[in-house]
From Swiss-Prot:
Transmembrane segments: none annotated. GO terms for biological process: cytoplasmic translational termination. This is Ribosome-recycling factor. Keywords: Cytoplasm, Protein biosynthesis. It is found in: Cytoplasm. InterPro entries: Ribosome_recyc_fac, Ribosome_recyc_fac_dom, RRF_sf. Belongs to the RRF family. The lineage of its organism: Bacteria, Pseudomonadati, Pseudomonadota, Gammaproteobacteria, Legionellales. GO terms for cellular component: cytosol. It comes from Coxiella burnetii (strain Dugway 5J108-111).
């Protein structure tokens, strides 16, 4: 019972971390990375489809991504989708290859993105703390129903607190790493 609560909490906290990682990957730093464009939806025969499912995305150099559509007629819709994504990118097409040069980030944009990173990290921390609270409430219920002793409850709460502290430390590490990436010129 106690192990089930702890394991459930751990898996839910790890999902929160995974979600944060995904959100941070979407934010543009000064360097080219395929995850920057993977979430963009492209009109593929009237169906909104992720770019990664209609083309291959590669890093050409540190400031340029190249996109090779799997179908020739997808070049136009991919270009439009990138422009509509509001990432401040201007794709250039050369035959079947779409090159996306990444302009250097302005200081103002860097600060804005750093603020977004801090907000996303705070959302992840809150989610992890909510999971801890729910687990502790479940443990209190078990104790009220006399299924576990007070000592077992305290030990389990300590284990959940250690887990929470470790996950929040990981969130802080990911956020500070992303902020450092953003502020590097």
């Amino acid at each position: 019972m106690i192990n089930d609560i702890i394991n459930d909490s751990k898996s839910r906290m790890e999902k929160s971390l995974g979600s944060l990682k995904t959100e941070l990957a979407k934010l543009r730093t000064g360097r080219a990375h395929p995850s920057l464009l993977e979430h963009i939806k492209v009109d593929y025969y009237n169906v909104e489809t992720p770019l990664s499912q209609v083309a291959s995305i590669a890093i050409e150099n540190p400031r340029t991504l190249s996109i090779t559509p799997w179908e020739k007629n997808m070049v136009g819709p991919i270009e439009k989708a990138i422009q509509k994504a509001d990432l401040g990118l201007n794709p250039a097409t050369v035959g079947m290859v779409i090159r996306v040069p990444l302009p250097p980030l302005t200081e103002e944009r860097r600060k804005e993105l750093a603020r977004v990173v801090r907000e996303e990290a705070e959302h992840a921390r809150v989610a992890i703390r909510n999971i801890r609270r729910e687990a502790n409430n479940d443990l209190k219920e078990l104790m009220k129903e006399k299924e576990i002793s007070e000592d077992e409850e305290r030990r389990a709460q300590t284990a959940i607190q250690k887990l929470t502290d470790a996950q929040i430390a990981e969130v802080d590490k990911m956020a500070s790493q992303k902020e450092a990436d953003l502020m590097a010129v």
